[in-house]
Amino acid sequence: MYSSYSLSKCLVSFHILAIQLFIPSVASLNLTNVYLHHKCRVGQGKYHPGSRYEKDFDSLTSFVAANKFIDGFVHSSNSDGPNSTTIIFQCRGDSYKSNCRTCYDTALAGFRKRCPRNKGGIIWYDQCFLDVSMINDLAPRKINYKDTFAMHNPNNVRGDTKMFSKKTNDFLQQLIVKADKPDMDGVELLYYAAGEMRIGREKLHAMVQCAKDLADCKSCLEWSFKELSKCCDGKRGARFLGTSCNLRYELYPFLRT
């Protein structure tokens, strides 16, 4: 029997603040799903081939795969016993249904390859992340400040970097406010916002997003925004990622329209 909304809050710390990534082609970014980073939860141990844990884990991954990914988010657990496993999977806000399903397949294969037989771990791709853990917690989830990292374009903007940073930061703050507003039905918070704006001759593209089961989206995004500012002001593109929320800006389009 599978249940939703239970996740680990026992996470090992890692924090990477200046991983540089330069993507030269807009087309390749839009059409591919680039691997970004991963972390194996070695403290949760490994499972043996043919074990009960492996069977339960395979059953859970198949259960998640059967999801239609309508809103691009899944949070599911298989039990509360010693073989308990929780999967949290979320796609970028512009990736859902078939695009999201493809990213799930890619992320699961990547997790199995990079964390072979690990009972827990996290893997991030350009359009989604997959979080696997043995330790469960009930939703709404608290902010995970530990499993985060930043990436930025190695190049700085030309001209007035202070003006660029101010306008970029102001725009990101506007998106954060928008993401924390109710949807059209007034039932749930959006937890996602994207947009573009002109800065001189350049056009800025940006997005912010929270996990659907997060207790406090705005606080997570505001904290991530501050962390991004520490490493990446004046860069031509940057992002800050985690399992609770993420934000990104570029000087080229990177979202589906």
Swiss-Prot record:
Protein name: Cysteine-rich repeat secretory protein 34
Main location: secreted
InterPro entries: CRR_secretory_protein, GNK2, GNK2_sf
Pfam families assigned to the protein according to its UniProt record, in alphabetical order: Stress-antifung
Similarity comment: Belongs to the cysteine-rich repeat secretory protein family.
Keyword DNA repair carried by entry: no
GO cellular component: extracellular region
Source taxonomy: Eukaryota, Viridiplantae, Streptophyta, Embryophyta, Tracheophyta
Disulfide bonds: none
Nucleotide-binding as UniProt keyword: no
Domain Gnk2-homologous, residue spans: 35-137, 145-254
Gene name for this UniProt entry: CRRSP34
Subcellular localization(s) per the UniProt record: Secreted
Record's signal peptide: 1-28
Keywords of the record: Repeat, Secreted, Signal
